[in-house]
Regions:
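Hydrophobic membrane-insertion alpha-helices, especially the h-region
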Residues: 1-7
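Active-site beta->alpha N-cap acidic-glycine motif
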Residues: 10-100, 104, 108-118, 209, ...
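CE4/NodB-like, metal-dependent polysaccharide N-deacetylase domain
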Residues: 51-60, 64, 85-86, 95, ...
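Short histidine/acidic/glycine/proline-rich micro-motifs that form metal-
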Residues: 65-70, 93-96, 133, 155-158, ...
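Charged helix-capping and loop-helix junction motifs
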Residues: 78, 105-109, 163-168, 194-197
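His/Asp/Glu-enriched short active-site or ligand-binding loop at hydrolase and phosphoryl-transfer sites
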Residues: 133-173, 207-219
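Catalytic grooves of carbohydrate-active enzymes
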Residues: 172-214
Length: 226
């Protein structure tokens, strides 16, 4: 039992594997493209700052938004869209999506879907699980609601103490088809916030155009059979 529990724990946090359906952590492409994803929010401080930074570098990103945060922050969601960015579903309450009932998963997905559509989002088909956690119930719910499970293959996992170190780690890991995860929405994300311009500069210096997840998927070389 202990071995089984450990195996399930590892699967639940695996970035590029899902017991049900497909977990997209990287896109097989012959184009030198990377996708930038920004998780959480929207927040009154972090979102305008992130949008300003993206505009400065003429870059679009995919914002995975929390439903409870988006409700009441419709203008921020609309500004994300107006700037040409993409919006994805990041659950309603930002809890770990493991060990719940089918109804719970459906509610988390569809309450967020409703909040985002109320703010003007029309094309909703990308879902990122909070903390990257998933087993069987969540992927099944995503399939029921025609969502794709989007993970990532690049993040700062080194606990960088400076924006320069953070950016260097992210830029070093990037390769064609990478999906980059950053958290820049909250006060506790100061290092990542300061690193964002450095990441954009570093990726550009390496010759990587930065796109949304949806754009990256359009350059996918092959789609695995379902």
């Amino acid at each position: 039992m202990l071995a089984l529990a450990f195996a399930l724990f590892r699967v639940s946090r695996a970035r590029c594997f899902s017991l049900v359906g497909e977990a997209i952590c990287h896109v097989d492409t012959d184009q030198p493209l990377v996708a930038l994803t920004l998780d959480d929010g929207p927040t009154a401080d972090g979102t305008p700052w992130a949008l300003s930074t993206l505009r400065r570098y003429r870059v679009h990103a995919t914002f995975f938004l929390i439903g409870a945060s988006a409700a009441g922050q419709e203008k921020l969601v609309q500004q994300i869209l107006a700037d040409g960015n993409e919006v994805g579903n990041h659950s309603f309450t930002h809890v770990r999506m493991v060990g719940h009932s089918a109804g719970f998963y459906d509610s988390e997905i569809m309450r967020t879907d409703a909040a985002l559509r109320q703010a003007g989002v029309q094309d909703l088909h990308l879902f990122r699980p909070p903390y990257g956690k998933k087993l069987i119930g969540l992927p099944r719910a995503l399939a029921r609601h025609d969502y794709r499970l989007i993970m990532w293959d690049v993040e700062d996992s080194s606990g960088a103490a400076t924006p320069q170190a953070y950016a260097a780690e992210v830029v070093r890991q990037a390769r064609p088809g990478s999906i980059i995860l950053m958290h820049v929405m909250y006060r506790g994300d100061r290092i990542a916030q300061a690193a964002l311009p450095l990441v954009l500069q570093g990726l550009k210096a390496r010759g990587f155009p930065i796109v949304t997840v949806g754009e990256l998927l359009r350059y996918r070389r092959s789609v695995p059979p379902h």
